[in-house]
A protein has these predicted regions:
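Extended alpha-helical targeting/anchoring segments
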Residues: 1-355
Length: 355
């Protein structure tokens, strides 16, 4: 019997599409896809509303991503004409095989990364102009918090498993994932869980606040830093209030509770300021209602979410593609887990795009 590490290497070298998603004890690998659904603005509703019979298999699920543009369209927020590489708005796969990798990925490629210099999609003057316009919008009360997207691009072919394995060693994140398909790959070291739905229970875990690890800075000192830092505290409070409000739209009255408030989570190179919010879903709520209420994730957009999305979309000249969309799975029994796609690389048509 082959070890899971050997099976991973064999699957990678076979050229077959596969997905790796961080689990509590290691990683889950999904492959042997029997269906691939490319989403667009017309079919996303039917995809989310369709019901499948569960055979109580670990592979009774669809796994994939919703892009930023698709999520905007789902809540009737229009995006003006932007530069677009025509990458799919969302893709979901039905796996027939799942492997559990209970330790590190331990994969190293002999190939060296070859890429040209990175080009940034917005120059300093343009960024400053947008920044100053948004400052005026904050002063006039149109938004309270807003987050601009910047992209770095280079011509390159990448080995996604090699990149993902190395990133997992240097920056292991609880919502990390990678997708390798024939014509594209995605790598993300996302730390943020946007939705975990089990039965009628739903949780969200907003992150707002980051400090780099330095010598002598432990979790207690990091917590004191966040508490004393007015900017970090106010930003966190705003995002938590917004996520509670989003949950309240789909949950039973009085069921939305803050279970963990302003705790510090430790990563290899930094500390995050985190809260955990739980709720009990209303009986009539469907998965499409949850997606519409919670996505795109507010902590990487700003607040109030709807108005802020419109402001961003009118100023940003290039499509975000996967960035600030969501990756995860929908089980046949209706349970879901989705992250927010940040700290990501999209490789498509031999262009690597970091957002």
């Amino acid at each position: 019997k082959l070890s899971t590490q050997k099976q991973l290497v064999d699957i990678h070298h076979s050229g077959k599409p596969y997905i790796i998603y961080k689990s509590k004890k290691g990683f889950d690998l999904y492959t042997n896809f029997s269906r691939k659904i490319i989403l667009n603005n017309k079919n996303v509703g039917s995809f989310l509303n369709k019901k499948y019979k569960s055979k109580k298999k670990e592979t009774d699920l669809f796994i994939g991503f919703f892009g930023y543009e698709l999520l905007n369209n789902l809540i009737n927020i229009k995006i003006p004409n932007q530069k677009n590489i025509n990458f799919p708005k969302g893709i979901f796969y039905k796996p027939e095989k799942k492997l559990k990798i209970n330790n590190k990925l331990n994969y190293k490629s002999k190939d060296k990364f070859k890429g040209s210099k990175f080009k940034i999609n917005i120059n300093k003057n343009s960024y400053a102009r947008i920044f100053n316009q948004f400052k005026k919008k904050i002063k006039s009360g149109e938004t309270y918090q807003i987050k601009i997207c910047t992209k770095y691009k280079t011509k390159s072919k990448i080995n996604p498993l090699d990149f993902f394995s190395r990133l997992s060693e240097t920056n292991l994140a609880p919502e990390a994932f990678m997708i390798r398909d024939k014509n594209y790959s995605i790598i993300s070291c996302s730390p943020e869980n946007l939705i975990t739905k089990e039965g009628s229970n739903i949780t969200t875990k907003p992150i707002a606040g980051t400090v780099k690890k330095t010598k002598g800075l432990n979790k207690i000192k990091a917590l004191n830093y966040f508490k004393k830092n007015l900017k970090e505290t106010k930003e966190h409070n705003m995002i938590v209030d917004m996520e509670r409000n989003d949950l309240s739209r789909i949950c039973k009255v009085g069921s939305v509770k803050l279970h963990k408030q302003k705790i510090v989570e430790e990563y290899k190179d930094l500390f995050h300021y985190v809260s955990l919010i739980k709720g009990k879903l209303k009986k009539e709520i469907k998965n499409i209602d949850i997606i519409k209420a919670m996505m795109p994730g507010g902590s990487v957009i700003g607040c109030p979410k709807i108005n802020t999305l419109s402001l961003l979309n009118n100023q940003e000249k290039e499509n975000r593609n996967i960035y600030t969309g969501s990756f995860g799975y929908i089980k046949f029994n209706g349970d879901m887990r989705f992250n927010i796609i940040i700290r990501s690389i999209l490789n498509y048509k031999n262009i690597s795009e970091i957002s």
